[in-house]
Amino acid sequence: MTGTQAQSSDNAQQPDGLIIAAETRRMIWNAVAVDGDRVFVAGPRWAGVNGPAIALIDGKDGLIPYPDASWNAWQPGSDVTKTFVNVNAIRRDDHNGLWVIDTGSPTFGGDPLPGAAKAVRIDLATNRIGRIYPLGPRVALPGSYVDDIRFHGDHAYLTDAGRAGLIVLDLRSGEARRVLDGAPSVTAPTGRPIVMDGEIVRMPDGSPLRVNSDPLEVSPDGRYLYFGSLHGPWSRIETRLLDDPGISASELASNVEAWADLPPVGGTAMAPDGTLYFTDLANEALKKRAPDGTITTVVQYPGLHWVDAPALAGGFIWLPVPQLDRLPLFHKGTSKVVWPIRLYRYKLDAQAN
């Protein structure tokens, strides 16, 4: 990985403490996970680049397909159950596992291919697939975009950014359930647009981009799941209610509470003390929300343009910068991406992780 200090294309001075950890012209990195000295990155197929779905950065600038080449070799018409069709998130758990969230849809806004949507756990000690959790047609619906994952005990929680809702996954049985389908707490509001470079991000038909349930975190004590659409605001609900399949949909909905009125965010990470780090898209900034609700700016820099899915590891917060709004999809087929794509890291206070 390169430690080169550099300036972005707008010549703004890079802030002290912000380090370029790696860069590439092959992938659009929207996710990162760290295991000791190993750094993993991932990016969605619909971004239109030619790198692997998941890569291990080899310490120079190379990208090694992970866990192997075959899992990264999906082509239209090939097996979707043992390959990555479209990776949207990777996440390291507390038991030496790397989780991969495959939306199952190779196109943005498309339907998951039959049998393709899944959560895959890789054993980091052996670099082999430990278990595959299929997200069947009752969970990954037409229009679903399974987005990200968090854990508590024997359960995992996933967001669906396409068909608004949450997914509860029993890690022992493998059974998955949809909850809060179409609820206001998981649905993108119409009055909070995503603004980047001073303009509303729009779909090819000209309508504002709306992303349903996307960011989520579990409180350090495991009591609450915090969640919301990408646009905000955030809500919370007790995990014990989510974990109980006997709780009715109406009772579950009645127990959703307002939590934090955050702006549109690219991604979040929660520290052990309950501090929520989030990337403020419009302001190209990393901010933090203290447990008492106070919000402060950690670092602001034009190079942090649409930071997605940060990760806390080794005393740093790792910040992939995919520049998603600059992809051709959102600009009538013309790319506005400023190459190279970069992964930054920023040193945090000792208590952060």
What do the predicted segments below correspond to?
Residues 19-52:
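Beta-strand-rich domains and repeat architectures in extracellular enzymes and scaffolds
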Residues 25-36, 78-97, 101, 138-157, ...:
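Beta-rich, blade/repeat-based domains predominating
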Residues 40-73, 109-111, 124-125:
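Beta-propeller domains
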Residues 41-48, 100-104, 111, 158-162, ...:
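Conserved beta-strand positions in repeat-built beta-propeller and related beta-rich domains
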Residues 60-99, 103-107, 112, 131-139:
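Blade-loop segments of beta-propeller domains
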Residues 63-73, 130-134, 177-192, 244-260, ...:
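Beta-propeller fold detector
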Residues 172-176, 237-248, 348-352:
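Short loop/turn segments immediately following beta-strands, especially the blade-tip
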